[in-house]
Amino acid sequence: MSVLPVVVVFGMSFPPIFIEIIVSLMLFWLIRRAITPTGLYDLVWHPALFNTALYCCLFYVVSRLFV
């Protein structure tokens, strides 16, 4: 059970995991913007798989921080 309450925005209620998804998505965009100019994506075999794994790792870290 999550400690965070239900979030209500303009009459629509969102579960607590919605905040975690948004925070991890913002972190993902920031890290991806930082990684792209460095040329790291040239070393990655499958960029889409790398992005998915990066987002999953970030979501796990963020969800552990919120609980």
Curated annotation (Swiss-Prot):
It is found in: Cell membrane. It is a multi-pass membrane protein. The chain crosses the membrane at residues 3-23, 43-63. The keyword Cell membrane applies. GO terms for cellular component: plasma membrane. Keywords: Cell membrane, Membrane, Transmembrane, Transmembrane helix. InterPro entries: DUF1656. It comes from the Bacteria. The keyword Nucleus does not apply. Belongs to the AaeX family. This is Protein AaeX.
